[in-house]
């Protein structure tokens, strides 16, 4: 009987010792955990700024249409612009006044006349800024001339005389003053999208771009 009691005492002591060890280990882990400092969160992605030349500005006046004869019914209208930093043209936009019916095609040209992008507008509103986001943004170089334009299939447009007689600058973008790099406020009578190469009264035809940088 004494052997059994001794065995039980020994077993109880071992069990108590085991529980004590588990308790002490738990306290130790809790102390270590309480001092744990999580790593800082990853930095947020860089903010990409985007800007347009004319912002929320809007022209006054009504839709115009030049009768040219000779079976030419369309017109292409554009603006020469530069960015002071490298960037990407995300969209080409134009201001539409009531009555500017027909199909419209956005285009972007390099200064040497190379076509960089051409897409047809869809889901236009009756008036206001019409924005076409390019299927693939076009990279542009700083301080380099580009031409943003749109083709109006029925020859409708809005213009502001002498609107580009002086440069128009917003943030990193500048619509060049007429004669800074050749003509500006450019147009061309045509029945299909084509690089505009004429100018009249330094007109602003309210063509614009959205550039990210």
Question: What role is predicted for each listed range?
Answer:
Residues 92, 143-152:
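Short beta-strand segments enriched for Tyr within beta-sheet-rich domains
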Residues 129-137:
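Exposed aromatic-hydrophobic patches
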Residues 1-12:
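N-terminal secretory signal peptides that target proteins for export/translocation
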